[in-house]
Amino acid sequence: LQKIVRKVNAAKPDIIFFTGDCFESPYNLNLRTLEPLKQLSAPIYFVAGNHDGYVGTDSVKALLRQVGVHVLETETVEDHGLQIVGLDYMRADEQDGNSMHAPVGDATIESVCKELIHKGDLPLVVLHHNPCGGQYLEKAGVDLYLAGHTHGGQLYPLIWINDRLFQFNRGLYRLGNMQAYTSCGSGTFGPPMRIGTRSEITVMEMKGK
């Protein structure tokens, strides 16, 4: 984590987004593990992923808050001229059977778009762990959709399978007027290796129209 923090700070970001899966094991679920996050040079916003649920989502959120991370729980904030919506882990809609893991609560991206996401004058950025429900977010006027979850497949042939499972498996996509980016993540799940994908720290520059 210390190495990741150094690389992030070297990019001199204005704001940092973390789209979940901070932990996959309870053995390192402690403040000492997260201490390097205090050194980040910009505000960081986090939404929880399914792996965080494996070790206890509430515990993960509590620890992250103690090191200064802004944890978003299906809510909207404004920072650095952006309207930022952070969603808890949820399905795309009531018919979504491809979430792969049990979602948190009854909310769906479709229902949240009707209740929470209201396009204003600021660029609208949505953070959600699973890159699903893009059609609802685009219709709601979202400018940028940031997600993770897929690890890009991590290992061949899972890359090929993921490309067919997920609407946005990895990298940059455009859906109507919305751009979506799914990060492969800076770590791994299970075996500490990748074949056909690379770990990443994504740097984006947003420009006004």
State the predicted function of each range.
Residues 1-209:
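Soluble catalytic domains of enzymes that build or remodel membrane lipids, polysaccharides, and related
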